[in-house]
Amino acid sequence: MDPHGWPGVPYLEGSTEHRVPTAVDRGRRGPAGKEGDGFLNPAMSGNRTRSVLMLKHLANTSLRGVQKIQTIDSMCATGIRTRRWLNELPGDIASRLRVKMCDMNENALEWARSNLRNDPLGHNVSVIRGDARKELLSQGWHWIDIDPYGSPMPFLDLAMQATARRSVVSISATDTAALSGSSRGPLKRRYGAQVRLDPLKHDSGLRVLLGAAAVAAARHDRVITPLLSVWDSHHLRVTVLVDRSKRGANAYQDSIGWRVANPSQRDVELAIGAGLLPPHDAGSTPMHVMLPLSASPSDRSNVSGPLWTGIMGDAELMRSLSGEAASLICGSGDSALDTNEQKYARQSVRNIEKEANAILSLIHISEPTRRRTI
């Protein structure tokens, strides 16, 4: 049975026409409210576009041998992310997906079911009302998408525990004020970290989130490899490859440490000795350095951490997230709408391809009129 108000109004994202209860401002930025029937936040469209492109790339690389890609779209709301996977991925990849969509809002799920009804691959999707934390543990997953309202910390351990032998986990965090150091109490309580309020605060926030993912993975004999780390408007998002490896889990602390601003010469020497700074930087005074966890700086006023000190992305995957690739997934048949969607799609991957070989692999996607900063 269709939900009250069906068919509602059309909303186009990528090349997928989705039905929602009320009109959505396609250009809206920033966070949305936690409550509401038929929830859909257009500010997360870039997040979903990158999700489509990453799944396309990884289905042919890291997950190439997986015939049925067991996927969970937790906190799915009306299901726009899953529908974009089904409609915008090449058919040979989309047909491999076995998706479970779950949410606590029954009305949103009714809209999701009705939206799926005419999708050719809708039969490969199950729509479940329930707590994502319970559904995560219902089976092993090759692809896990965590997109909560606020902090992802309540879901991290369960997600890592639920991964298959090799899996991809995408983690969104909208508690940006905490992760970027503005709200120190929540940052300390949730992540056990501190972040210095400086131009690198969002980089540090991404690294704190990666560090939390690495620690959670290690608790369950897993090891992470960062694939993409993005600050986009009001949220942070990291995507990691997760492999089962007791040896890798034992060594997780090798990639956890501290960021020190205005370092002393001793800090520089420690960073070089730990392999976190090139030897040719000896004698210089960089703006900041990474130090290993064992360094435990005594002066915490210029320190961020504990956080991830390794690279934050995979160059091959990042090169696949090009403006051209993003534009190609936008083709509804309406040239005017397609042009607009192509603009949004290209914006969602702006700078990623050309930063593929950057040593920090940090991507900052901000307002269209602002430039990326590292």
PLM features: what roles do these ranges have?
Residues R96-K100:
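Short beta-strand element of Class I
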Residues D2-G65, I69, R81-E88, C102, E106-W141:
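S-adenosyl-L-methionine
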Residues L156-S167:
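A short glycine-rich, Lys/Arg-flanked "PGG" loop and its adjoining helix->strand segment in the class I
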Residues R166-T174:
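Conserved beta-strand signature within the Rossmann-like core of class I S-adenosyl-L-methionine
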Residues D73-I80:
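Class I SAM-dependent methyltransferase "Motif I" SAM/SAH-binding loop
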Residues I363-I374:
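Residue-level detector of conserved catalytic or cofactor/ligand-binding positions
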Residues K246-D334, D338-V349, E353:
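Cys/His-rich short segments
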